[in-house]
């Protein structure tokens, strides 16, 4: 909806989810991240042109878990908006964030974030599948996605999914209510899992910003080990891991996120994305660590 409602330049990053990247079109500037997956506000500022109408940056990266400085990016956009107003320039500029990955772990209050538009995915917070949300500042003139009966403010006509909407609202209320305690719990489990793996394999590489990342995410690489083989070996043991985003698990290509942060091909090909959730506990994390260590040792022996 946002992209189809503007006709100007877009600024985004090279590590956005494919759902965003593949919809951006050609009139776009993609900002490169740091090696930790951070998007610098100064780079966003440098990428903005007189015809830029939209900046879209995910609140947190879906693979690395790195949390972006969205409030600082929002200040960059507000400063540009003020400059245009004072100069008599009429081109609007808006900030959108895909907060799907961060809901339940990050404060997504739109006023505090300073965004003009925000999207969420119910499935990411244990809500109904295939239900999404777009919050949008009223000053943005959106073009309809589906025309017809005028439901959902005329933007997406058709009979509303009432049950899905209610389920989404309840799920969002629950995850926000337990956000702080769940973050603390997941962070302890994640760190426990990370410590077990890095103690067993000191040469392993943990990617992402260690100080600013989602409590649920651990991205770790084992250079020289075929991660695809690990995935299949671990699945047989009941341990579900991924080599990249779940949506791209069967693409057979190297992660564009890992390429963007400059991770060496050998390390990228040995990367696992481990995510924790409501059902994770200390016992299951310890068991998962044991199985991962055993699988890597099996692969090392095979390659010796």
Regions found by a protein language model. Name each.
Residues 1-304:
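Pyridoxal 5′-phosphate
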């Amino acid at each position: 909806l946002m992209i189809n409602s503007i006709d100007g330049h877009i600024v985004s990053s090279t590590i956005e989810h494919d759902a965003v990247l593949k919809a951006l079109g050609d009139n776009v500037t993609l900002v490169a991240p740091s090696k930790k997956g951070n998007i610098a506000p100064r780079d966003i500022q440098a990428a903005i042109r007189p015809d830029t109408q939209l900046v879209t940056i995910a609140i947190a990266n879906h693979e690395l878990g790195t949390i972006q400085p969205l409030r600082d990016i929002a200040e960059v956009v507000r400063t540009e908006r003020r400059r245009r107003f004072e100069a008599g320039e009429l081109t609007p500029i808006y900030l959108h964030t895909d907060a799907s990955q961060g809901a339940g772990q990050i404060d997504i209050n739109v006023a505090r974030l300073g965004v003009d538009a925000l999207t969420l995915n119910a499935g990411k917070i244990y809500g109904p599948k295939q239900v999404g949300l777009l919050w949008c500042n009223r000053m943005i003139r959106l073009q309809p996605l589906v025309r017809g009966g005028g439901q959902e403010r005329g933007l997406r006509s058709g009979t509303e999914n009432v049950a899905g909407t209610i389920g989404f609202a309840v799920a969002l209320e629950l995850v926000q209510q337990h956000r702080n305690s769940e973050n603390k719990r997941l962070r302890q489990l994640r760190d426990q899992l990370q410590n077990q793996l890095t103690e067993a394999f000191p040469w392993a590489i943990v990617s992402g910003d260690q100080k600013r990342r989602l409590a649920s995410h651990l991205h770790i690489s084992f250079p020289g080990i075929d991660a695809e083989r690990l995935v299949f070996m671990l699945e047989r043991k009941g341990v579900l891991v991924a080599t990249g985003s779940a949506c791209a698990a069967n693409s057979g290509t190297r992660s564009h996120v890992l390429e963007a942060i400059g991770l060496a091909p050998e390390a990228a090909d040995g990367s696992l994305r481990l995510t924790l959730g409501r059902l994770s506990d200390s016992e299951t994390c310890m068991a998962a660590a044991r199985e991962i260590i055993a699988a890597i040792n099996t692969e090392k022996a095979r390659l010796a």
